[in-house]
Amino acid sequence: MPYPEQFIAPMRAELTRLGVRELRTTADVDAAVGAPGVTMIVVNSVCGCAAGKARPGIALALQHDRRPDVVGTVFAGADIDATDRARAYFEPFPPSSPSVGLLRDGKLVFMLQRSDIENRDARQIAERLTAAFDQYCESPARST
C-alpha cells in the first residue's frame, strides 16, 4: 500500500522546489531517460538518510554550474510503478532507496546507492555528485 500523499508531500517538495521534476508514471520515467544528454533520477524515500543526507546533498549538488540536462525524481513506496521502472534502468544495481542514477543517452553511467549515502554527510554526497556531473555532463544544464 503506498504512503499517504499528505505524509510524503513535504519530502517531495524538498526536491521539486529545486526544479526537480516528479516522475510519477512509467511513461514519465521513460520520457526523462529518453531525453538527449544526461538524466539524473533520484529515488526519494521517507528514511532518515534521505532527509538528513541525500536530499540536502542533492540540493547542494544542483548549485554546481555543470548539471544533468534532465533531473527527475520518483518516490519509493508511493510512485510504485515509476520507481520500478527507474530501478530497471539502474540494473545491475539492486533496488535501493534513497539512490541517485545518472544516465547518458539512456545508459547508466553513475550510481549512488543507499550504502554510498548513509555513511556520508550532505557535503560529501554533493561532492560525489558534482564529480560525476563534471565527468558526464558536457555543458552547464539547460533545464531540470
Predicted regions and their residues:
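N-terminal leader/targeting and pre-domain segments
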Residues: 1-37, 137-141
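Short helix-loop-beta junction
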Residues: 7, 11-14, 59-68
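Structural signal for conserved beta-strand scaffold positions within catalytic alpha/beta enzyme cores
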Residues: 24, 73-75, 102
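Local sequence-structure signature of Cys/Sec-based thiol-disulfide redox active-site neighborhoods
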Residues: 31-65
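Thiol-based oxidoreductase modules, predominantly thioredoxin-like and allied folds used
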Residues: 43, 66-85
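Conserved strand-to-helix beginnings and helix N-cap segments that scaffold or border functional pockets
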Residues: 51-56, 83-84, 122-123
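Short acidic (Asp/Glu) patches
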Residues: 83-97
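Non-catalytic, surface beta->alpha helical segment in thiol-disulfide oxidoreductase systems
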Residues: 94-141
